[in-house]
Amino acid sequence: MRETHRKVARTVSNVLALMDEDPDFTYAMSSAQQYAWLEQEHPDLFARMLQRIKEGRFIPVGGMWVESDNMLPTGESLIRQITFGMRYFREHLGVEPKGLWLPDSFGYCGAWPQIARRAGFEWFLTQKISWNDTTKFPHHSFEWEGIDGSRILTHFPPSDTYGSTVSMQELQYSQRNFLDKDLSRNAILLYGYSDGGGGPTREMVARIRRDHDLAGAPSIDFGTPDELFDRVRHDIVDEAPDETPVFKGELYLELHRATLTSQQEMKRGCRREENLLRTTEYLCAAASVFNPKYRYPREELDGIWKTLLLNQFHDILPGSAIAWVHRQARADYVRDIARLRDIAAEAGASIASVRDDADMRSNAAIVPYTAKNGDSWIARTAAVGTQDDDANGTDAVADESTIATTCDDGRIILDNGLLRAIIAPDGTVRSLIDLDNGHELVPDGSGIGHYELLRDEPYEWDAWDIQRDAFLSAEGIDDSHVERVTETKRGGATVHVSSTTDGVSIDACITLRAKSKSLEFRTKVDWRASERFLKVDIPMAIQADRAQYECQYGMVERPIQKNTRSDEAKYESCTHRFVRVADAGYAAAVVNASTYGSDVSPIHRNTASGPVRGTMIRLSLLSSPLYPDPNTDKGVHEFAWNVVADASMPAVLDEANRLNAAVLPAVPAFDPLAQLNPVDGVMVLDWVKLADDGSGDLILRVYEAVGGEAHARLAVNAALGKATVRECSIMEDARLDAELPAAFADGDPSVARTAQGAMLSLHPFQLATLRVSCGSDGGNTDGNESRSLR
């Protein structure tokens, strides 16, 4: 990071010198974080840059805090990249970028078009998909349609680079390669020495002057991204509305697949901090509503957010930075997670001091979604994290406890009346039966919990890539055995398993709890291997064509059977908290607490007893590349995942939220600030926070989670008085995109309506941001709505 600070200053200094020499030269720079460093460390240079910004020649683009990874962060993190970035651009630079500028991230999630449009963006630019190793993307100028149906104008530079030197070869390649020249003659060329190389040079600027209108060559000139997108919109949307190219779904990068796994501590730290921020911001908002003496720690929370957003940069969170950067990021996570726990405790104590009904719960979590109506956003003594208690914190009665039986042949049977698991002496689960319907989840001859090592020796891009042929080199860790069986505190039973091979030691706990339809796996891995990649097998006796993977604000389906080259290229894919497979009559899912990489493939083999069919899910746990950090992930790591039987979508979301919710030593239980009472469908209230403007209003983030229509009534805490609610943009203002569906089915989305009982209506995977304003009779509102929030 220290060198990045210097790179920013060198590049801006170089660019400003070029602007002094050439009155037509323009330059675009993204990332509010870069401008903030420059403002703090080089105020004279910053002042010179501001003048060029006012002239329209130095062009802030992107509107984000940094050019983040786009597959791994939560949807809320992507939103905060925008809100923090745009706030800085507005307040410090006096501009509002119109488009997302992400030339170098490793894939783009299917929620981006909706997030971008609901933030007010008009266009999206990247060139990274041109790096695909298997197929060529079909367009350069098109409308990208997200999982919810939102569309955003998108352009890929046909030069297939973000670091052109403006050579004639590059210009001719760009013209020849442009796939949409039947509709448009306009494209962008990103030039300059990139990745900290200093930007454009005099020679490059001179080439643009020389080749501006050269006969027989593409015409080239200085311009701005907004000018380019105005032309592209005119060409492919306004002039040819019936021929506008459209691409729907995620932009999967057929490369850099190992970034879903490299530097696991980056993934675990990010997931933990995101979940803890959700709980902490909620408790701080509640303390502000309930207690007029509470001072909302806005500045400190903003600082923690900015550090998290920086650590989501597209080489840090994916695990492809140098060792020093990852050491600093790990220290950031440790420090900020500890501070967030303290802030949450302070807010909880403030609530308890003024609310007689705020019962303090020990070792508790606030779960944002539960399948049981009325349980969400209420502190509950939690099984998540510690795995010591059941979800309600009550002792299980004897006849509902899990019974563990050790057989003469060494097998162990766990039975809780809902599930029966049979664990072989080698520690793999050879049978898992749903006792409600007799469904066997494990294919014949297979075992859940078998670990495999792949050779991690990619042709290039060591920490970035895992090759397809690495999957052919998989070797099982067969030195594995059951060590003992123990009882949990509240009626469950745990089988302890040990597995070892050269450089790898694995201690696993397999637990079946009372009254649960999930089999839990808690694994500690001592990882000393080099150039190896660790996966765990989870075979399912379910024949399915496609698997469902959670992503930001919804899920995506990817093929299990690889019929096309594009299908084959998706041999390692991103999943957030769950992956689910289903046939016509049954579904199962795997829910995780900190992993992102996975592969899903068909099981198809013939045995003497008959054909065996099913689906193999494998979670990617650890990798060990030598570059750029030769000690990647050396050390001890802990993982948690659950196999969910009879996995309806509400049940899977419930399990995913419980497993990932932040567990705190003490949390006050009180009526939620806001809650959704479902009418039909699956709608999730994902985040509750105070508005950024210090007004004291609440901001609610809701979305439809499973791809169907959903209706729910909003309920708000009585302390908010006769509160009103209206829909707002992601920027928390009233500027709504008229082309996107509204959250309320009964009228103008910008009109304030009574919050209590307001009916929400969302389309598949629709996201909505709601602003709840306290009534004059509400709790601690003092009329001017300041309430010590600053």
Language-model region placement:
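CE4/NodB-like, metal-dependent polysaccharide N-deacetylase domain
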Residues: L78-A111, R118, S174-I188
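Acidic, His- and aromatic-enriched active-site or binding-groove loops in soluble protein domains
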Residues: P43-G63, P113-F137, E143-I152
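Alpha-helical scaffold elements lining the catalytic groove of polysaccharide deacetylases
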Residues: N70-Y88, P158-L179, D469
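Catalytic grooves of carbohydrate-active enzymes
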Residues: M1, S150-R355, G585-P668
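Catalytic domains of cell-wall/extracellular-matrix polysaccharide-remodeling enzymes
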Residues: L93-P138, G198-M204
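C-terminal (or distal) subdomains of carbohydrate-active enzymes
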Residues: W112-R117, W131, H140-S141, F156, ...
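Conserved, mostly hydrophobic/aromatic
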Residues: G85, L100, A116, T224, ...
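N-terminal catalytic cores of secreted or lumenal carbohydrate-active enzymes
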Residues: M1-R80, F89-E91, L251, R278-T279
